[in-house]
């Protein structure tokens, strides 16, 4: 079977389109009415089941491994910022390519902990997930953290962050810019106890103030940056650098996939992390994955002399000057 994740906060027309596109044989739900329960039951009542309905069931047949590494495994919808959301087709190979990178990430966390917190002998790490399960960032954690014997702490709402992190000690978490700023204020104002031992906030490299990140690193936090997208199954680049010069970087490319910066500055990725394509949309797939297998991310990047990559903007936002020069408004804004 193929797993399809859905965002319950979308409008019914959006969900109706996505469900209709994938034509499911079974829909599992938690029984909560998110504003479209009546429409869901009217349209899909015969295949609608409670989330826990499987616990009393018996398999209809013996389960054998009949799937290939490159067969479709999961469908995840993109945000749809450029129109209707697209269903990204991900395979087993995609997930295990990314899982390999995440295992390296966990080992880097342990190395940091042994060096900077030698008094803490507990090597069972915990990850606080505030992103929903339909988000690839949390979904991939379900593969990696339990396999390592580590804890995954799930929170359902950003507004409950301080309550939940107090109840569930966590070493690491992926953070949005607003939350990183809140963590920074807690540390600078002597309120670090509110974070209950959190020491590895992980961000998306294009969004944060480098000086703020460097200051958090000086205060004893391990700052990591991750670049990835649904179309690469979350794989991309991870930055472990803690110095102010490189801390805002997306990091150095690893050996899990290939990376290049095209002549127009667009970051391209090729390898086992790249999606199978967009479901039922070969034209859209051809627009982003070329004949040589390179995924064109739509993000602009540059690399410094030491091999660190920096995300500088979006290709679609480029301003073309009269001289023919391409200028990224995001990069221009930072200079101003």
Label every model-predicted segment.
Residues 1-26, 86-89, 149-157, 224, ...:
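Short beta-strand->loop structural element characteristic of the AMP-binding/adenylate-forming
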Residues 2-62, 66:
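Structural core segment of the AMP-binding/adenylate-forming
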Residues 58-77, 83-84, 94, 110-126:
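Conserved pre-ATP/AMP-binding loop-to-beta segment of ANL
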Residues 72, 78-81, 127, 132, ...:
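Conserved S/T- and glycine-rich ATP-binding loop of Class I adenylate-forming
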Residues 96-126, 133-197:
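Conserved AMP-binding/adenylation subdomain of ANL enzymes
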Residues 171-175, 184-245, 258:
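Gly/Ser/Thr-rich phosphate-binding loop
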Residues 253-262, 266-321, 326:
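Conserved ATP-binding/catalytic segment of the ANL
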């Amino acid at each position: 079977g193929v797993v399809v994740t859905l965002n319950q906060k979308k409008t019914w027309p959006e969900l109706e389109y996505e469900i209709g596109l994938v034509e499911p044989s079974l829909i599992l739900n938690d029984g909560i009415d998110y504003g479209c329960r009546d429409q869901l039951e009217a349209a899909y009542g015969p295949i609608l089941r409670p989330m826990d309905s499987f616990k009393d069931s018996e398999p209809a047949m013996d389960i054998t491994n009949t799937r290939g590494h490159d067969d479709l495994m999961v469908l995840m919808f993109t945000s749809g910022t450029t129109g209707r959301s697209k269903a990204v087709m991900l395979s087993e190979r995609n997930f295990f390519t990314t899982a390999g990178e995440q295992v390296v990430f966990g080992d880097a966390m342990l190395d940091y902990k042994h060096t900077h917190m030698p008094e803490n002998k507990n090597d069972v790490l915990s990850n606080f997930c505030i992103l929903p399960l339909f988000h690839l960032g949390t979904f991939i954690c379900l593969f990696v953290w339990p396999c390592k014997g580590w804890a995954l702490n799930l929170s359902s709402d950003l507004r409950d962050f301080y309550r939940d992190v107090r109840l569930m000690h966590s070493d690491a978490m992926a953070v949005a810019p607003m939350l990183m700023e809140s963590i920074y204020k807690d540390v600078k104002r002597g309120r670090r106890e509110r974070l209950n031992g959190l020491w590895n906030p992980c961000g998306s490299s294009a969004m944060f103030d480098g000086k703020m990140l460097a200051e958090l690193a000086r205060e004893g936090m391990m700052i990591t940056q991750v670049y990835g997208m649904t179309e690469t199954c979350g794989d991309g680049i991870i930055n472990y650098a803690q110095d102010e010069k490189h801390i805002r970087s997306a990091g150095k490319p690893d050996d899990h996939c290939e990376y290049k910066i095209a002549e127009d500055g667009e970051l391209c990725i090729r390898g086992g992390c790249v999606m199978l394509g967009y479901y039922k949309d070969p034209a859209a797939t051809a627009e982003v994955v070329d004949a040589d297998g390179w995924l064109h991310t739509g993000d602009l990047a540059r690399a410094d002399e030491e091999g660190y990559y920096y995300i500088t903007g979006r290709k679609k936002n480029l301003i073309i000057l009269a001289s023919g020069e391409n200028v990224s408004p995001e990069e221009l804004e930072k200079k101003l």
